[in-house]
Amino acid sequence: MCPGNWLWASVTFMARFSRSGSRSPVRVRGALEEPPAVQHPFLNVFELERLLYTGKTACNHADEVWPGLYLGDQEIANNHRELRRLGITHVLNASHSRWRGTPEAYEGLGIRYLGVEAHDSPAFDMSVHFQAAADFIHRALSQPGGRILVHCAVGVSRSATLVLAYLMLYHRLTLVEAIKKVKDHRGIIPNRGFLRQLLALDRRLRQGLEA
């Protein structure tokens, strides 16, 4: 399990979970416009949170959640020896900042790097990064021997959200299918704002398939 990290994430989740019946919806500034079916998303989000909190809740510093795709935390991203052992060729950092991750950190390892400066806040618009992150993951896995680590600080919210979006955009999984696929290998807890944005993406993709 992730020492300390999962306990922190679980406490954070329970705080969200316990308030689900009393809070009115919060508009995510600049986020994808939600279609009518998710304009009042708490029931849908509540059900997703219940799904997220069932089944596998353990995690390692990195878990392979899709062939060649590892979801992990900052500690594994800093461990060059472990990155070599796993054969990582690309790193997507969803908690990029001047203090956390730069391309220079992987000089000499032959690792391609993409940083997304995201905040683990329900008000943060992660949806603007969905396509670019999914494209980067796809390019990594399309090259021979390509393996990618997608990480943030803990590896359960920001990075997990981008992995779910990738599975939806490139493999046409529904959001529920993507969550179940990832949770077969790692416990994740995207924050409520990220879940709303994923629901909006899910609806848009489903409408596109039906058109």
UniProtKB/Swiss-Prot annotation:
EC number(s) from the headed UniProt entry: 3.1.3.16, 3.1.3.48
Pfam families per the UniProt record, alphabetical: DSPc
Gene3D superfamilies: Protein tyrosine phosphatase superfamily
Coiled coil: none
Keyword tags: Cytoplasm, Golgi apparatus, Hydrolase, Nucleus, Protein phosphatase
Class in the EC hierarchy, top level: hydrolase
InterPro entries recorded: Atypical_DUSP_subfamA, Dual-sp_phosphatase_cat-dom, Prot-tyrosine_phosphatase-like, Tyr_Pase_AS, Tyr_Pase_dom, TYR_PHOSPHATASE_DUAL_dom
Gene Ontology cellular component terms for the protein in this record: cytoplasm; Golgi apparatus; nucleus
Superkingdom of this protein's organism: Eukaryota
An example Gene Ontology biological process: negative regulation of MAPK cascade
GO molecular function annotation: MAP kinase phosphatase activity; protein serine/threonine phosphatase activity; protein tyrosine phosphatase activity; protein tyrosine/serine/threonine phosphatase activity
Tyrosine-protein phosphatase domain span: 60-207
Homology family: Belongs to the protein-tyrosine phosphatase family. Non-receptor class dual specificity subfamily.
Function: Inactivates MAPK1 and MAPK3 which leads to dephosphorylation of heat shock factor protein 4 and a reduction in its DNA-binding activity.
Name under which the protein is recorded: Dual specificity protein phosphatase 26
Lineage: Eukaryota, Metazoa, Chordata, Craniata, Vertebrata
